[in-house]
Every structure is written in structure tokens, then in C-alpha cells.
Swiss-Prot record:
Top-level division of the source organism's lineage: Eukaryota
Topology Lumenal: residue spans: 30-495
Keywords for this protein: Endoplasmic reticulum, Glycoprotein, Heme, Iron, Membrane, Metal-binding, Monooxygenase, Oxidoreductase, Signal-anchor, Transmembrane, Transmembrane helix
Location relative to the cell: Endoplasmic reticulum membrane
Record-given protein name: Amorpha-4,11-diene 12-monooxygenase
Pathway info: Sesquiterpene biosynthesis
Length: 495
């Protein structure tokens, strides 16, 4: 009996030891496997994750620099938000085609919740039936080629007003082009939306700028979305709530005034379209939905178009040969005409090359807008959990040296034989993003860049003030969701 018990004890000990060894081997194997399948990433800190790597730099450049070291598909832990970053045309094409629907959502943000009426605008709306209907309205009604064309006369009129204002300021005196161009685009969009410029233009402009400042995606509320107390401690919730009250007051007054005067208008404005659809049986819109969409038009339209014009002029000032070439093309084609019509400049190839090259180097949204994974995805062997944020670094993609020779240089001629318009065939050129969540306002945005830029270059010669050499122009970028100049563009016109 003792021998049996001894054997049983030995057997049990052996079994436990064997089980322990097998469990250790299993855990080691699965851990090794998991490690092998983890996306490359920099070293991280507790709580904040990888945020410290982005301190002291603009997000798009900071993320680009990390990608150069850790790869064009990498993982970042931004606070409590797992994030994958795409920085190459190859991975952008793979994800925005094969996995486009899996990453069709937008992350919920405090800004979207408060300022954009619970994310009911086109840009931040979650993927689903509501978003599909909004996208359809944009494509067929608000931002169709026909609708964009219908605003041609007001674009021409407002561009001519800008020319007259600059001339009135006097030759040889510095002009704040940043301020003037932003005001021009805001006025064009105001008239397109409401049928006229609005008396509270300055207030609307400040609201739009504040919204853009709050949507950078890297502040406390964005990286710790579940820590509600931080939203209060940081002051962001209070700022956004105050901003929301201003928006409600301003847009409610505009809509009320517009409704009273609707019988006197002949051209259907963007607000007319939305009010017509408001009580539609097919897809009714609420008043808050309409306000969110109007904010999209201004927020996405004003800053992106004005900054593109600023960057184009900045690059041309820095590159006198390109400036001379585009001005010669304009002046030859227009042959002394006083006012420019859009038909006059549609076929001006070098002007269009300048715009494309500007958008390559200075995409309006350098990190586009983040997407979010709707379901777990296996991406090239990597397991991507649900709710993972996706950042596509268009800034890095547009400057990828594997696809672009002298990628950091401003060379409009590189587009001479290119058919790329708003997207490159290999996703090497993505100024407006790609896939389902691609910017629906590309046609309107390009129209609001081409004519103003042509007027500014055709009617005036430009130089830096105080005898500063062209190669000393400040090209520093600001930090935020959109790619703006850090300093305002002050230039001296002659005519």
C-alpha cells in the first residue's frame, strides 16, 4: 500500500510539475507570438503612453519622424487611446481600399459632442444610415458640380472686390494677405450659404477658428475620453459650452433672418437646400442637424481654402522662377482683361500645377481626420482591436521620397504629365484623403482656391516687406488640425 501511495504521490508531483512546465511553455509561446505580431512602436511611459514623443513639434511632423524610425505602419498609445499610424502610400492604399469599411467610423470627441451637435455633421458623424444620407445630400445637392458652378458669379464678384481693396491700400504698402484671403473665402461661403455676406462675419470667423483650434486631436479630452473630470479640470468643456451658446445664437439669428427674406431670392443657397430637406419624409433634418452641417461648410471650407492660397503664394515668393512662370501664363492668357472669369483660367496648366504642388507639400488636413475601427481586424497578421484610432499621415505620404523625387522641394513641373487631380493612382498624393470618408467638398475647395489665387497673381507683383530677401520668408507651420502658417503673410504689392 505504501508503495502504491508513494507512486501516486510521485505521479501527482510529476503531473503538477509537467502541467506547470506546459503552462509556462504555453504562456511563453503565446507571449512570443503576441510580441511578434505587435506593431512596432517607440518606448512608452505609464498613463500618457507615447504622447511625450510629440512634445515640441507639430503632430504631423512628429508622427512622420517616428515613422521614419519605427516604420510606415506603427502603433502609438495616445493616453488611453490605441492608435495605428499610416505613413506610406502602400499602407494607405491597403487600408483605405481593402479595410475601408472596417475603419469607416470617426472617434467620438468632446468637440463633436458639444459644438457639432452630438456629431451630427457630415465630417464627424458615425458610419451608418444617417451618415450615408448626409453624404448623399452633399454629393447630389450641397456640393455637386452643378451647385459649385452656380456660385461662380459671386466668387468672381468677391475676388474683384479683393483686388479693389488691395489697390485702394496703395502700391508699396504691406498687405496682410492672411487676413484678406481668409475674409474673402469666408464671405464667399457666407453668400453661398445665406445669399449674402453676414454682418456678424467677424464673430463667425472667430467661431470657426476656435472650432479648428479645439479639433487638433491631441489634447487631454481627446486622449483621455473616459476621464470626464479631466474635461472639466482642463477647462475644455466650459470653453466648448460657451462656444456652443455663441453658435446657437448666431446661426439661429441667421436662419430666422434668411427665412423672412426667402421670397426675394432667385438663387437657391445652401441653407435653402437644407430647409427644403428639413421636413422631407425621406430623410428629415432637425434644426441642430442643419446647424452642424453649416458649421462643416464654414469650418472645413474657410480655413482649408485660405491656407492653401497662402501656402501657394508663400512657395511662389520663395521660388521666383515659378512665380515668373505662372504670372506670365496668366497675363498671356488674359491679355490685359480687367476682370477674370473662371472660364478664362480652367485650362491654364501651370497654374493648376502650382495648386497641385501646393496641396502636395501643404495638405489642408495633414493628418486628415482620424478614423476608428468598427470591428476587430487582422491587418497583415496584426490584430487590431475594435475602437482603435487610425491616423493617415497625408503630410508624410505626399512627401514620400520613394514616390517623389526631391520630395521636399516645390517643383510644380512634376505634375506636368500627371493625371492626378484629387488623388494619386498609387495613393502617393492624397490632399483630400481617400475612401468612404474622403472630403466631399474637394470641388468647392478647388474652385475657392483657383480663382482667388489667379486674381492675386495676375493683378499684382509681390515682394517681402522691409527689403527682406525671398529666401528668408518664414515657412513655419502652426500646430493644429489644419496646416496653417504660424505667422501671417505680409507682402508688398505693386501694380
Amino acid at each position: 500500500m505504501k508503495s502504491i501511495l508513494k507512486a501516486m504521490a510521485l505521479s501527482l508531483t510529476t503531473s503538477i510539475a509537467l502541467a506547470t512546465i506546459l503552462l509556462f511553455v504555453y504562456k511563453f509561446a503565446t507571449r512570443s507570438k503576441s510580441t511578434k505580431k505587435s506593431l512596432p512602436e517607440p518606448w512608452r511611459l505609464p498613463i500618457i503612453g507615447h504622447m511625450h514623443h510629440l512634445i515640441g513639434t507639430t503632430p504631423h511632423r512628429g508622427v512622420r519622424d517616428l515613422a521614419r524610425k519605427y516604420g510606415s505602419l506603427m502603433h502609438l498609445q495616445l493616453g488611453e487611446v490605441p492608435t495605428i499610424v499610416v505613413s506610406s502610400p502602400k499602407w494607405a492604399k491597403e487600408i483605405l481600399t481593402t479595410y475601408d469599411i472596417s475603419f469607416a467610423n470617426r472617434p467620438e470627441t468632446l468637440t463633436g459632442e458639444i459644438v457639432l451637435y452630438h456629431n451630427t455633421d457630415v465630417v464627424l458623424a458615425p458610419y451608418g444610415e444617417y451618415w450615408r444620407q448626409l453624404r448623399k445630400i452633399c454629393t447630389l445637392e450641397l456640393l455637386s458640380v452643378k451647385k459649385v458652378k452656380s456660385f461662380q458669379s459671386l466668387r468672381e464678384e468677391e475676388c474683384w472686390n479683393l483686388v479693389q481693396e488691395i489697390k485702394a491700400s496703395g502700391s508699396g504698402r504691406p498687405v496682410n494677405l492672411s487676413e484678406n484671403v481668409f475674409k474673402l473665402i469666408a464671405t464667399i461661403l457666407s453668400r453661398a450659404a445665406f445669399g449674402k455676406g453676414i454682418k456678424d462675419q467677424k464673430e463667425l470667423t472667430e467661431i470657426v477658428k476656435e472650432i479648428l483650434r479645439q479639433t487638433g486631436g491631441f489634447d487631454v479630452a481627446d486622449i483621455f475620453p473616459s476621464k470626464k473630470f479631466l474635461h472639466h479640470l482642463s477647462g475644455k468643456r466650459a470653453r466648448l459650452t460657451s462656444l456652443r451658446k455663441k453658435i446657437d445664437n448666431l446661426i439661429d439669428n441667421l436662419v430666422a433672418e434668411h427665412t423672412v427674406n426667402t421670397s426675394s431670392k432667385t438663387n437657391e443657397t445652401l441653407l435653402d437646400v437644407l430647409l427644403r430637406l428639413k421636413d422631407s419624409a425621406e430623410f428629415p433634418l432637425t434644426s441642430d442637424n442643419i446647424k452642424a452641417i453649416i458649421l462643416d461648410m464654414f469650418g472645413a471650407g474657410t480655413d482649408t481654402s485660405s491656407s492653401t492660397i497662402e501656402w501657394a503664394i508663400s512657395e511662389l515668393i520663395k521660388c521666383p522662377k515659378a512665380m515668373e512662370k505662372v504670372q506670365a501664363e496668366l497675363r498671356k492668357a488674359l491679355n490685359g482683361k480687367e476682370k477674370i472669369h473662371e472660364e478664362d483660367i480652367q485650362e491654364l496648366s501651370y497654374l493648376n500645377m502650382v495648386i497641385k504642388e501646393t496641396l502636395r507639400l501643404h495638405p489642408p488636413l495633414p493628418l486628415v481626420l482620424p478614423r476608428e475601427c468598427r470591428q476587430p481586424v487582422n491587418l497583415a497578421g496584426y490584430n487590431i482591436p475594435n475602437k482603435t484610432k487610425l491616423i493617415v499621415n497625408v503630410f508624410a505620404i505626399n512627401r514620400d521620397p520613394e514616390y517623389w523625387k526631391d520630395a521636399e522641394a516645390f517643383i510644380p513641373e512634376r505634375f506636368e504629365n500627371s493625371s492626378a487631380t484629387v488623388m494619386g493612382a498609387e495613393y502617393e498624393y492624397l490632399p483630400f484623403g481617400a475612401g468612404r470618408r474622403m472630403c466631399p467638398g474637394a470641388a468647392l475647395g478647388l474652385a475657392n482656391v483657383q480663382l482667388p489665387l489667379a486674381n492675386i497673381l495676375y493683378h499684382f507683383n509681390w515682394k517681402l516687406p522691409n527689403g527682406v530677401s525671398y529666401d528668408q520668408i518664414d515657412m513655419t507651420e502652426s500646430s493644429g488640425a489644419t496646416m496653417q502658417r504660424k505667422t501671417e503673410l505680409l507682402l508688398v504689392p505693386s501694380f
